[in-house]
Design a protein with these regions (language model features):
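Short aromatic/hydrophobic contact patches that present stacked aromatics
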Residues: 146, 384, 417
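Short, charged/polar surface micro-motifs in flexible loops or helix N-caps
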Residues: 14-16, 40-44, 352-357, 423-426
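C-terminal hydrophobic structural anchor segments
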Residues: 401, 405-471
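A glycine-rich phosphate-binding loop feature that marks nucleotide/adenosyl-phosphate handling sites
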Residues: 185-188, 283-285, 342-354, 412-424, ...
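Gly/Gly-Pro- and Ser/Thr-rich, intrinsically disordered tail segments characteristic of DNA damage-repair
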Residues: 1-286, 290-293, 441, 446-505
Length: 505
């Protein structure tokens, strides 16, 4: 399983959030019907996880709660028909449901506990560190890692499969959570082996699922696989474009890439469609991936940004959403100050609600959302600041300026996103010479200099206030001190401060 002398393992924790909730309740994660979702929101809320036994009924791992409700109703209607018209007690256990057809399918709805999931994920990462050094582990997400295990196989006198199984069983003993693994001769192949192959292989005697791929076995086993969206980095947009020209599989992509210049299907066709990203698509179609672990560890982005976004619980009016935008801008400023970063460019994106088009009174530009519904096109605007700063006043004024001039006040609002771009460290700015101030013939230089001094004094006072707020929040919690606007109707900061990643902590 080595190409150019490298062997990689990817490990994915099975239905991680749902498994944590099952273990906390003393239930079997593999046989308990459970979804992780905030039922206090509407049934449109997204399920963060669905347990394997519930997925077996055809429920997506990222379903909306109402989709789970509807699908379970359908399943129970079919069970009722087969049982002669009556179903008795509900059961959330797959074994009980299989043995007793008269029982109705039930399921548990567990509210998210993001802090708990982070704690368990850290515990599992520490298990991996017993076997692999941190420089050879890439944490891909809260429930997924990739490892370069090349130098460890000889040390442990193990095959890659044996090492993967050893770590998975250790995680199971430590936390009760099961995992699947993919082994490959490069990072792409180990990821695809885990994502696609491991789900379909038979578990071994210990219940562990591990799949292996090299370039040749990848071509033999997955060149005809559908859908394309199962492959790493191929989203719905890519798949739709490829299918529009008759390309449905990775094998089709590979064949297209070696077409002659005078043929319709050739490499140039892919580059015209996807630009430079076609190179990665073609490499992956052939099972190639030049990126190594040291490349990931050495990577530093050319530009940095901080983004804050939220989906509102219900449609907000222009004025009500403006209050939330102010809260978000102030939070972004505090975040920058805490990280000792400054920005001179801010971007605001506002998404409108579906209700704006429901009555047929809206006649502006529309787009189609992922559910095929027509909604007003989002508003997007950028504000450039005269100097790099983390001042809440400067950032808030700039963002609200974009909001007031760009957003349609007649439309109800559902999504808000603020991005602080072109970030640099405070110390970097302090070392740069100040930009000269341009005066004209009619300016009173003394007055202008006085204004600049007053502005500097205001910024220093504001910074002290912001630093004091940060200290209070760190000691007593994020809600220990809030701006007055956060107590008004429609404000969201107080509730969001209790969340991690937009979900209950």
């Amino acid at each position: 399983m080595q190409q150019n002398g490298r062997t990689y393992i990817a490990i994915d924790l099975k239905s991680f959030y749902a498994s944590v909730e099952c273990m906390e309740r003393g239930l079997d994660p593999l046989t308990t019907n459970l979804v992780v979702a905030d039922a206090s929101r509407t049934e449109k809320t997204i399920c963060l996880a669905v347990s394997p036994s519930l997925k077996a009924y055809g429920i997506s791992g990222r379903a909306r709660l109402f989709e789970v409700v509807e699908r379970v109703k359908e399943v129970n209607a079919e069970r009722r028909r087969k049982a002669g018209g009556n179903l008795f007690e509900k059961s959330c256990d797959a074994h009980e449901l299989a043995v007793d057809p008269s029982r109705a399918v039930g399921y548990l709805v567990a509210p998210p506990q993001m802090a708990k999931y982070i704690q368990i994920s850290t515990q599992i990462y520490n298990v991996y560190l017993k076997y692999i050094a941190p420089e050879d582990i890439h944490v891909y997400s809260i429930d997924e890692v990739m490892m370069d295990v090349t130098s460890y196989l000889e040390t442990y006198h193990m095959t890659a499969r044996e090492l993967a199984k050893t770590m998975i069983l250790d995680v199971l003993r430590t936390t009760g959570i099961t995992a699947t693994a993919g082994i490959g001769s490069n990072l792409y192949l180990c990821k695809v082996a885990m994502d696609i192959m491991a789900k379909h292989v038979q578990p071994d005697k210990d219940g562990v699922r591990i799949a292996e791929l090299d370039e040749m076995s990848y071509r033999e086993q997955l060149w005809a696989h559908r859908p394309l969206t199962d492959f790493w980095r191929v989203g719905r947009g890519y798949a739709k474009k490829l299918e529009a020209i008759g390309i449905y599989t990775m094998g089709d992509v590979a064949r297209c890439s070696i077409g002659k210049p005078n043929e319709y299907y050739n490499e140039e066709l892919l580059y015209r469609m996807f630009g430079i990203n076609a190179e990665l698509l073609i490499d992956h179609a052939w099972g190639w991936e030049p990126c190594r672990m040291q490349d990931i560890k050495a990577y530093r982005p050319e530009t940095n940004s901080v983004c804050s976004g939220q989906v509102l619980q219900c449609p907000y009016s222009f004025e009500k959403a403006r209050l939330v935008v102010r809260e978000m801008a102030e939070a972004v400023a505090l975040d920058l100050l805490e990280k000792k970063l400054v920005t001179d460019q801010l971007t605001l994106t506002v998404g409108y609600d579906i209700e704006n088009t429901a009555g047929g009174s809206y006649h502006g530009e529309t787009v189609t959302d992922r559910y095929g519904r027509k909604i007003p096109k989002h508003t997007h605007g950028t504000a450039n600041l005269p100097r790099k700063t983390s001042s809440a006043r400067s950032i808030t004024d700039a963002v609200l300026g974009v909001y007031d001039t760009k957003v349609n006040p007649k439309l109800s609002i559902r999504r808000l996103t603020i991005t602080a771009n072109r970030l640099v460290g405070e110390d970097t700015v302090q070392q740069e010479p100040e930009a000269p101030v341009q005066f004209n013939l009619f300016d009173n230089v003394e007055v202008q200099e006085q204004r600049l001094q007053e502005e500097e004094a205001k910024l220093k006072r504001e910074r002290k206030i912001q630093e004091a707020m940060l200290d209070i929040k760190k000691k007593f919690g994020k809600n220990a001190i809030l701006n007055g606007g956060s107590y008004l109707d429609g404000a969201t900061a107080k509730e969001r401060n209790k969340q991690i990643g937009g979900h209950k902590a």
